[in-house]
Regions:
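A short, active-site helix/loop in glycosyltransferases that binds the activated sugar's phosphate group
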Residues: 1-29, 38, 73
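Conserved donor-binding/catalytic core segment of Leloir-type glycosyltransferases
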Residues: 32, 36, 40-66, 72
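A conserved nucleotide-sugar
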Residues: 54, 72-100
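Short alpha-helical segment that forms part of, or immediately flanks, the ligand-binding pocket
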Residues: 100, 122-127, 141-142
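Acidic donor-binding loop of glycosyltransferase active sites
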Residues: 104-117, 130
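Short hydrophobic beta-strand element within catalytic cores of glycosyltransferases
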Residues: 131-138
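A charged, aromatic-enriched C-terminal amphipathic alpha-helix characteristic of glycosyltransferases
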Residues: 174-205
Length: 207
């Protein structure tokens, strides 16, 4: 609180942070998206797969915070119901390099059940063309003034909703190329690291 009161400006990189600060510091709070350097990222638009490859990363110490403790059992229910139409790739407490390698082959990533917006991890996945099932509320699109792209499969923190969204993907695999292409476009449009860096510089110089 003391830092927020005495600083010249506040930059919120997520909608969640923005709505927390803006009521109290409306004159010095701004929103600037997270930066993604995709210069070394291989972007690949997914084709319609024979089997949907669902990817879930689990950090044992943070499973309840990220919601993977709820999503993972539901994902296994889907795989049990549709064994010939989907498979699961898990990264449990995996080193970052291995985690990224496993993500590269995924069609859909499950991440951040309780979030309104995509995390850094989700944005990295999207930059690769991986579809994210996680936080993607309308507030996320409104704050960046995105009118058309809707690449994120938004999910609510309920087992029923998670099941329905996962089942929708399995039964509508033809949408995977479209959502994958939108994911790449979304990151390049709103999270270009050079563009974001310039926004930081502009805000700094103005304050």
């Amino acid at each position: 609180k003391e830092i927020a009161q005495t600083c010249n400006g506040i930059i919120a990189c997520l909608w969640e942070y923005y709505v927390a600060y803006i009521p109290y510091f409306p004159d010095k709070t701004t929103f600037i998206p997270l930066p993604i350097d995709y210069s070394n990222i291989t972007s690949r638009v997914r084709t319609e797969p024979e089997k949907v490859n669902f990817f879930i990363g689990i950090q044992s110490a943070r499973s309840d915070i990220k919601g993977t403790d709820i999503m993972y059992p539901v994902l296994k229910e889907i795989q049990k119901k549709y064994p010939d139409q989907c498979r699961i790739t898990e990264a449990i407490d995996a080193p970052y390099a291995i985690y990224q390698k496993l993500m590269d082959d995924a069609d859909v990533q499950l991440d951040q059940l309780y979030s309104y917006t995509p995390s850094m991890n989700s944005l990295l996945a999207m930059a690769k063309g991986v579809i994210v099932l996680g936080g993607g509320e309308e507030e996320n699109y409104e704050i960046i003034n995105e009118k058309e792209l809707r690449p994120i499969i938004n999910v609510y923190p309920s087992e029923e909703d998670i099941f329905q969204k996962l089942e929708y993907i399995v039964l509508n695999k033809e949408r995977i190329p479209e959502l994958s292409a939108q994911s790449i476009e979304y990151v390049r449009k709103h999270h270009n690291y050079v563009k974001v860096a310039q926004q930081y510089v502009d805000f700094w110089e103005a304050h």
